[in-house]
From Swiss-Prot:
<keyword id="KW-0406">Ion transport</keyword>
<dbReference type="GO" id="GO:0046933">
    <property type="term" value="F:proton-transporting ATP synthase activity, rotational mechanism"/>
</dbReference>
<protein>
    <recommendedName>
        <fullName>ATP synthase subunit a</fullName>
    </recommendedName>
</protein>
<dbReference type="InterPro" id="IPR000568">
    <property type="entry name" value="ATP_synth_F0_asu"/>
</dbReference>
<keyword id="KW-1133">Transmembrane helix</keyword>
<dbReference type="Pfam" id="PF00119">
    <property type="entry name" value="ATP-synt_A"/>
</dbReference>
<keyword id="KW-0812">Transmembrane</keyword>
<feature type="transmembrane region" description="Helical">
    <location>
        <begin position="30"/>
        <end position="50"/>
    </location>
</feature>
<feature type="transmembrane region" description="Helical">
    <location>
        <begin position="128"/>
        <end position="148"/>
    </location>
</feature>
<keyword id="KW-0472">Membrane</keyword>
<feature type="transmembrane region" description="Helical">
    <location>
        <begin position="91"/>
        <end position="111"/>
    </location>
</feature>
<keyword id="KW-0793">Thylakoid</keyword>
<dbReference type="InterPro" id="IPR035908">
    <property type="entry name" value="F0_ATP_A_sf"/>
</dbReference>
<feature type="transmembrane region" description="Helical">
    <location>
        <begin position="214"/>
        <end position="234"/>
    </location>
</feature>
<comment type="similarity">
    <text>Belongs to the ATPase A chain family.</text>
</comment>
<dbReference type="InterPro" id="IPR045082">
    <property type="entry name" value="ATP_syn_F0_a_bact/chloroplast"/>
</dbReference>
<keyword id="KW-0066">ATP synthesis</keyword>
Length: 241
């Protein structure tokens, strides 16, 4: 690496190192909060710019936002159903955009140039705490969707089509957030580690196509998470006959 000293900040690996903030008796990962709010701020800025002067014939940022709106609307309508999909569009859209921006922000923004006392900045979704929190939000959401639409009839789902399904569906309630959180966390963390190792070993050639592949898989992971969240909500509000 002597010939490429400028690449050293990108090639350092600090797995499991965190910048801790103390809030009372609670320790939180400071770098996750920092990158999350920076990316949320960038996303909000994009929305403000795109909606500041709305035009009948959209172009630029407005055109991008309208494309995203149509895409999220179609996704929610397909997975949740015509009856209640509008109520859940903001939630599904927020999940998709936050995960998408977090994944791409981790891949495209040179966070490692910003030095911290401990740990390093990176994609919020490469931290298991973030993905578990998102998965638990999805679980709470489909419970709420089922109970608010059906009342206590929601629990008929656990014995449909036969009471034999009860233990399996109870276990499923635990496996859903586990699979959501670990799938997203594992894919994003693995992508960051692979790119960092390749930058260290082969700094100029090989990492570039791997980074493009990482951008593609990051977008797919955001889509999978949002689609599964919408599907679980749709499953909760579906009427069983």
């Amino acid at each position: 690496m002597g010939s490429f000293p400028f690449l050293l900040p990108f090639a350092e690996l600090e797995v499991g190192q965190h910048l801790y903030w103390q809030l009372g008796n609670i320790r939180i990962h400071g770098q996750v909060f920092m990158t999350s709010w920076l990316l949320i701020g960038a996303l909000l800025t994009l929305v403000v710019v795109g909606t500041k002067k709305m035009e009948r014939d959209p172009k630029g940022v407005q055109n991008l936002l309208e494309f995203l709106w149509d895409y999220i609307r179609d996704l929610a309508r397909t997975q949740i159903g015509e009856k209640v999909y509008r109520d859940w569009m903001p939630f599904i859209g927020t999940l998709f955009l936050f995960i998408f921006v977090s994944n791409w922000g981790g891949a495209l923004v040179p966070w490692r140039l910003i030095r911290l006392p401990s740990g390093e900045l990176g994609a919020p979704t490469a931290d298991i705490n973030t993905t578990v929190a998102l998965a638990l939000l999805v679980s709470l959401s489909y419970f709420y969707a089922g109970l608010s639409n059906k009342g206590l009839r929601y629990f008929e789902y656990y014995v449909h089509p036969t009471p034999i399904m009860l233990p399996f569906k109870i276990v499923e309630d635990f496996t859903k957030p586990l699979s959501l959180s670990f799938r997203l966390f594992g894919n994003i963390l693995a992508d960051e580690l692979v790119v960092a190792v390749l930058v260290f070993l082969v700094p100029l050639v090989l990492p570039v196509p791997v980074m493009f592949l990482g951008l593609f898989t990051s977008a797919i992971q955001a889509l999978i998470f949002a689609t599964l969240a919408a599907y679980y909500i749709g499953e909760a509000v579906e009427e069983h006959h």
